[in-house]
A protein has these predicted regions:
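Active-site core segment of subtilase-fold serine proteases
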Residues: 1-92, 96-112, 118-119, 172, ...
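Solvent-exposed, polar/charged alpha-helical surfaces in well-ordered, non-transmembrane soluble domains
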Residues: 24, 50-54, 95, 99-106, ...
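Protease zymogen maturation seam
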Residues: 1-11, 17-29, 34-37, 255, ...
């Protein structure tokens, strides 16, 4: 949710359990929300949010830990609770999720990262309406594709024109076996063995589409930092048009996919931060050829009905 002109002032949001607010590598925005209680500030329910936040915006060049995709971005933490035997907290309702998305859109968010999904193929109109509302307010709504290795579930699949759905690939450039796929998938990003921040103030290695989605949210932040006046559609087109075709997949023409050749397992392909920002900033030096291996590309599902982390 970039806001203004410089990366240090970009506002970014992630939806899920909220973020540990004392981590030296993270910058939190001074607005937060607890969708479970309907109050402010957000609450810390588990470690998932902190892990996602690090991928988006952990500080670079500070001699600590890792660097996020959009270093210095400010995170608007929004808590969404889930059923957990250890925490003993009841799951949030669909209304809580919808309210969280609307809160973000109404309080300056421009990128809404959603690293969660419901284990259902039935549309959830309340949440889909909130997604459409946020899109209409000028937000890019990013969703992880899910970790069941099956078709993308709700609500990511429920509002295709208003969401950017992200699957995961491994270090060799192939679709991760757990990554959701199908007609709703837009792009892929690294999602296996990703180093990020944790609630101890340290760092941890994680896998899942939850950690692919924030790569894309970070790139969106970089694009809007370069030109904050770009429309939602222009930003989305840049993300999809600057991808790399990877993993030995066969790409084809889909009449509903207007930004190039597409594949049901990896979408338009692997997001490319360098090419995306270059598409905004103008001609740039030719990027080095890194081949098909991602070994050189270091970073940079909750289940109500089975609300699950991705």
């Amino acid at each position: 949710m970039p806001l203004l002109f410089h990366i240090s002032t970009i506002l970014s949001l992630r939806l899920s359990i909220t973020v540990f607010n004392n981590h030296d590598d993270l910058h939190l925005y001074n607005v937060s929300y607890n969708a479970h209680t309907g109050g402010i500030p957000s609450g810390l329910y588990g470690d998932h949010g902190t892990k996602v936040a690090g991928v988006i915006g952990a500080t670079a060049n500070n001699g600590k830990g890792i660097a996020g995709v959009a270093s210095g971005v400010k995170i608007m933490p929004i808590s969404i609770c889930y059923t957990d035997n250890e925490l003993g907290i009841a799951a949030s309702t669909t209304t809580n999720f919808a309210n969280a998305i609307r809160f973000a859109a109404n309080n300056g968010a421009r990128v809404i990262n959603n690293s969660w999904s419901f284990d259902t193929s039935s549309p959830i109109s309340e949440i889909n309406n909130a997604i459409t509302y946020a899109h209409g307010k000028g937000c890019i709504v990013v969703f992880s594709s899910g970790n069941k290795g099956s078709a993308v579930s709700q609500p990511a699949a429920g509002a295709p024109s208003a969401t950017l759905v992200v699957g995961a690939i491994d270090r060799n450039g192939y679709k991760s076996d757990f990554s959701g796929y199908g007609s709703s998938l837009d792009v892929v990003a690294p999602g296996r063995e990703i180093w990020t921040t944790d609630v101890t103030g340290g760092y941890t290695c994680v896998s899942g589409t939850s950690f692919a989605a924030p790569h894309v949210s970070g790139i969106v932040a970089l694009i809007w930092a370069t030109d904050p006046d770009l429309s939602v559609w222009r930003v989305r087109n840049i993300i999809e048009q600057t991808t790399r075709k990877i993993g030995g997949n066969t790409y084809g023409v889909d009449p509903l996919r207007l930004n190039g050749l597409w594949n049901q397992f990896v979408g338009y392909g692997l997001v490319n931060a360098y090419a995306a920002v270059s598409a905004v900033s103008g001609p740039a030096p030719t990027a080095p050829n890194i081949g098909t291996s991602l070994s050189e590309v270091e970073p940079g599902d909750l289940s109500m009905m089975g609300l699950g982390y991705d």
